[in-house]
Amino acid sequence: MKKLFTVTAIGLALLTWHTSCTLQPKAPEAFTPIKVETPARPAGQEDVIQLVAPKIDTVRVGFIGLGMRGPGAVSRWTHIPGTKIVALCDLSPERVEKSQEILKNAGMLEATSYSGSEDAWKKLCEQEDIDLVYIATDWKHHAEMGVYAMEHGKHVAIEVPAAMTLDEIWQLINTSEKTRKHCMQLENCVYDFFELTSLNMAQQGVFGDVLHVEGSYIHNLEDFWPSYWNNWRMDYNQKHRGDVYATHGMGPACQVLNIHRGDRMKTLVSMDTKAVNGPAYIKKQTGEEVKDFQNGDQTSTLIRTENGKTMLIQHNVMTPRPYSRMYQIVGA
């Protein structure tokens, strides 16, 4: 036994020496924290957190974007009392016609059609008999359309994400404050039964003092990639890095942690894996090797708030996993 122990000890020593020789630490990587300052607020503007707009007896709605999500939204709105769909817009005339069929099948009047031009949406925003513009286009047009609609006297509802840069976020905020028009990001997960039940439990004190919340968007989009107009969503992931669809997890987490109602997000650290499935999918479809695919398969972001709470947000649309938002609440 003593001999075996001695041999084992020698082996461990040799392994340790070999590892120390072959796995010498590399020069430390330099990380420069990115500090984001709140820009100077325009004089005289008030926030819109508690904005109440004058009552509208019948809300007249125009839809921009009738591809992946738009037709479903049109269909749902045919069931909402006190609303009227008055305008439909898409670059493709065929898509507009398909949504007109939805109205016809619901026994509703045909809406004004806009299509055939990349600027056709502006004509919809300028149409006088519209109260609300519903935007369901590709992401890069969301903020521009929202700002233009509010500047033309319309309330705005935008599918997530409502904006892609900090500059765009502040454009939406400033325009909403200036025009006193609602600008709502249509984050549906904050209204799902599980998230609302959990929020109610948290507000009733079931979890005690909530310290940590987790959420995610885990959704393998392999079956959906071909349906996106001009391949815009895969293209965005190829050219951009990070959690590009954060609010499914972050929205419910912010509600529970009372973000902007006594607390605020202050610091984040985010990491991603290497890109594997994105480049593999493109090669499978086109036969071409992808030399530079920016977004990793999995992105994990840890956020700390001013009051010392944390949230963990994950994003993964590439790997073959079951759909999950991985919602969890940790209290003390």
For each feature predicted by the language model, list its residue ranges:
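N-terminal Rossmann-like dinucleotide-binding module
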Residues: 22-106
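N-terminal Rossmann-like NAD(P) cofactor-binding module of classical short-chain dehydrogenase/reductase
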Residues: 132-134
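Bacterial N-terminal signal peptides that target proteins for export
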Residues: 1-8
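Beta-strand-loop-alpha-helix segment that lines the small-molecule cofactor/substrate pocket
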Residues: 138-139, 143-191, 205
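C-terminal motif of bacterial Sec signal peptides marking the signal peptidase cleavage site
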Residues: 18-20
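NAD(P)-dinucleotide binding in Rossmann-like oxidoreductases
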Residues: 290-292, 296, 306-332
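Predominantly a Rossmann-like dinucleotide-binding segment in NAD(P)-dependent oxidoreductases
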Residues: 179-184, 189-293
